[in-house]
């Protein structure tokens, strides 16, 4: 059912799922752009547990869960010497020089970008054979990509590619989001009024649909990562230049928020928010 101007009070409480503690994102300024490939490598989460089950290669997300946590598994699933492109120049990494990389598992949230609502389900597509995980350094205008390919039923990391954000298919949206995520006044000016809203009843998980006035945005908005964000490309071509769907979720899948943006007359604006 539709509620106009005000969603029932219980919906407000449910937004807590989208609003955990505000986390401080690692400052990109402390990481030289050309050293990004080694900047996230630590052994904090690395383990030497037994080989994950074969089922871990079914979905990319299942594979990634183990890749980011298991040191032995990670090293086994990298094609060495690892191609490591930095602004087009290959600086290969030998197996002995590799440092365990937890990628985004240490983050309280990570983000994924799609060009429409339908493509959000691509993460569950078992036919996908090439996935690109990205770190997007908004403040420095840099992108680090991890290229994973599935060969003979197994996912492997084949290439790192660090380059200027200008080469990225989402460069226009990233430039917009850089300011949207940090400037409250800019946010308010780039939200359709009213905007669509959906949340779920915690008792029966029934959807609660409605619309909110832009003045209510500060009360409902999720904590949005800024400065440095992730993206996982499951094969999205981003051919729809007028729409982007940003999914903010936690590695544990304990929370998820979806923000839908549309571009009208060259200007991006938030049109819909969904909180799970």
Predicted regions and their residues:
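Short, well-ordered alpha-helical segments enriched in acidic and aromatic residues
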Residues: 62-69, 73-99, 187-201
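Short, aromatic-enriched amphipathic alpha-helices that serve as compact interaction elements
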Residues: 55-73, 170-185
């Amino acid at each position: 059912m539709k509620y106009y101007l005000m969603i029932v009070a219980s919906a407000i409480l449910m937004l807590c799922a989208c609003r955990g503690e505000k986390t401080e994102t690692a400052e990109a300024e402390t990481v030289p752009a050309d050293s990004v490939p080694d900047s996230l490598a630590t052994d904090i989460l690395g383990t030497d547990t037994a080989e994950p089950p074969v089922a871990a290669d079914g979905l990319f997300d299942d594979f990634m869960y183990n890749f980011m946590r298991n040191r032995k598994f990670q090293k086994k699933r990298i094609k060495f010497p690892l191609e490591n492109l930095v602004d087009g120049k290959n600086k290969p990494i030998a197996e002995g020089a590799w440092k365990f990389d937890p990628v985004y598992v240490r983050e309280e949230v990570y983000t994924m970008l799609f060009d429409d609502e339908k493509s959000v389900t691509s993460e569950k597509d078992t036919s996908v054979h090439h996935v690109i995980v990205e770190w997007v350094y908004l403040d420095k205008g840099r992108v680090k990509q991890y290229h994973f390919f599935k060969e003979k039923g197994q996912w492997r990391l084949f290439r790192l590619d660090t380059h200027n954000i200008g080469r990225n298919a989402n460069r226009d949206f990233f430039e917009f989001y850089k300011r949207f995520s940090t400037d409250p006044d800019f946010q308010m000016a780039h939200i359709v009024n009213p905007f669509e809203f959906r949340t779920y009843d915690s008792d029966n998980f029934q959807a609660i649909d409605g619309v909110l006035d832009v003045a209510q945005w500060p009360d409902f908005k999720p904590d949005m990562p800024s400065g440095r964000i992730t993206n996982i490309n499951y094969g999205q071509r981003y051919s729809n230049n007028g729409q982007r769907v940003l999914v903010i979720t936690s590695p544990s899948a304990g929370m998820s928020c979806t923000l839908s943006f549309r571009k009208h007359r060259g200007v991006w604006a938030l049109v819909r928010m969904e909180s799970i």
